[in-house]
Amino acid sequence: MLPDNAIGHKVEELLLSHKVDTSAIAWGGKRLGIYFVDKGNNYRTSNIIYDREHSSISEASINDFDWDKVFDNASYFYVSGVTPALTQSAADLTLYAVKEAKKRNIKVSCDINHRKKLWKYGKKIEEVMPEIVKYSDIVFANEYDAIKILGVDSDINVDSDISDEDYKSIMDKLIEKYSLETVITTRRETIDSNHNNISALLYNNKNLYKSKKYNITNIVDRIGTGDSFAAGILSGLNMFKDYQYILEFATAAFCIKHTIPGDWNLTTKEEVISLMESSEKLDVKR
């Protein structure tokens, strides 16, 4: 949902400029939720300041949306833990939406995406997200999310690095508990604010797929990298059949976003594939 004012319509124009279908946008509310980034450097971490109270989506209701239009020709429906963190009504809206998607046999993809600063209306994430995950097919979650938020029973210590076998043990329980199809996890080793090592895991049908690792120095912007990874997975599922290839595609998109300022991954399918199939950093295109 976007506010029916100049700012809301400017957002629609921006979406249209990138060939995003905006026909199902609901218009209402008075303001667009925003956030500010106090960008860190070296050993100083970045800090996010949210300004999302009374935003259109935080006050939206089920009846604000034309659900037939929302789900028309959809193959996947994506939600994250950011929306239900805003208000009780936003949490109710998210739950209704995933139930509606399942009724229509549309696969639901859910990113736990825990943002502690947003959960201020009286509910904790572990009280809300499990019910949403019940209606999901694909979940973006790590072992900490599985145990601490989604209630997987395990004695494995997830406060430090774990083995592949321990990871599979936890994810087997998560998949069984919620009847999931696939669980996907990003890995990030932070050397400092400008230097990270990243990779990803995909677990499906008891098969663990591991991406190659990218050593990223001189990071331009970390904001939006997780969303870029999720977008890479979903677009990959629509384009490719092989899970290893899909994971490598998404991880390359994840990597590229670290080089682009702002919240948008302004890259192309061709650039992503070029990186994922290269063993070296890319040279200047001439």
Each model region followed by its residue ranges:
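A short helix->loop->beta-strand "cap" motif at the edges of active sites that frequently abuts
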Residues: 101-107, 178-181
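Conserved post-catalytic alpha-helical subdomain immediately downstream of the catalytic base
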Residues: 209-279
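Conserved phosphate/ATP/ADP-binding segment of small-molecule kinases
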Residues: 118-205
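Short acidic-glycine loop/turn motifs at beta-strand connectors
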Residues: 41-42, 203-207
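Active-site beta-loop-alpha junctions enriched in small/polar residues
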Residues: 53, 82, 113-117, 144, ...
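Conserved N-terminal subdomain of the carbohydrate kinase-like
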Residues: 1-81, 272-286
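Hydrophobic beta-strand scaffold residues
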Residues: 22, 108-109, 140
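Catalytic-core regions built around general acid/base machinery
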Residues: 92-105, 127-135
